[in-house]
Amino acid sequence: MNPSEFLDGGTVSVSDETYAVCRTDRDHPAAFATVREAGETTVVVEEGDLDEVDASDVEPGWKRLTFEMELPFELVGFLAAVATALAEVDVSVFVLSSYATDHVFVAEQALGAAVERLEALGCVVAD
């Protein structure tokens, strides 16, 4: 399997919401994602919910790009292809994966460049 088979013609949705990545010491019930590690918990929340998060550090201003396709576990290099393509246009990424797909977060001010680059790879980007 080649990542380009999934990218070419694959749909990518752009979130209406803007997210913040927060370092905290507990879960948040409305979090899009929670990652627990020894010594810290990271939650990704909509910026409108920031007041409810007791965070020691906050990185606001992230838009979520969701690859609306089921990505098989044996697919090698998909995220590498996406991250490399976005790095070529100087777009930093924050990545989360679910069981079936990937979510790539980009800074709000870099969204236009990210969308253009994904479209150049053959993705259909939907708002």
What are these regions (language model features)?
Residues 1-85, 117, 121-127:
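Regulatory modules associated with amino-acid/nitrogen control
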Residues 26, 100-101, 110-111:
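Short acidic/polar capping segments at secondary-structure boundaries
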Residues 36-38, 96-100:
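Short glycine-enriched loop/turn motifs at secondary-structure junctions
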Residues 41-45, 100-107:
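A generic structural motif
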Residues 47-50, 107-112:
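Helix N-cap motif at beta-to-alpha junctions
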Residues 63, 89-92, 102, 121:
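Generic beta-strand structural signal
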Residues 66, 94, 105:
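Conserved beta-strand segments that form the floor/walls of ligand-binding pockets within enzyme
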Residues 76-98, 109:
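A structural feature that tracks compact, well-ordered secondary-structure segments
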